Each structure stands twice: as structure tokens, then as C-alpha cells.
């Protein structure tokens, strides 16, 4: 999923963004991606980005009006809904979801990015 599409500015169409509050989970996801050749880059997720979601009119806003860090702010928005430090991860696949030129698995269009990665992650760590 892609809450903002802003990850494309950072990573283009070569890597998907990985946001997580847990180093072990991040390592598992990165390893799974490497094995199936679906590239990820871990992006920052930090409480300092919270101030970008402060609102004068509501509990919070889901957009960063200051500018910059759009994908990180979107992931930090998701973080606000995680209870009790539950390990979680978000794959921002905006740059990887479609391919004009195709690749090893398709001739163009929707790529299915993340399906093999998540299958590998589950096979290695959760079955």
C-alpha cells in the first residue's frame, strides 16, 4: 500500500520503502525481500515526525503541510494507531506496484510486488 505516493520521490522505482517500529521484524522482512529479489529500503520512523501531524482543529491531521518527508509522515500517522508497542511494518510500494517496462515476472503493468516477499516471510518465520 502507499498512503501518500511520496516514497517515489525518495526511492523511485527500484526499491519499496519499509517502515517498522521493530528491528527484528525489519530484518526478517529485508531478508525475505532479498531472497525473492524484491528490494526494500528501511526508512525512518521516529516520534520527532509526530509534530508534523499536529492540528489546531482536530486530534491530528493526516497530511504534512510543512512539506517534505511525506512518506515518513504517512507512516508515522499509522504508528499513532499502534497500541502497546506492538511490532508492525508497512511496505510502501508506490514505486514498485506498476512497471512500464516489465521484468522477470511480467511484461508491464501491475507487478504483484510484495506477494513473493510476504510468502517468503511467512514461510521462514511464522509457520
How would you label these PLM feature ranges?
Residues 1-127:
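A generic structural signal for tightly packed, nonpolar segments enriched in small/aliphatic residues
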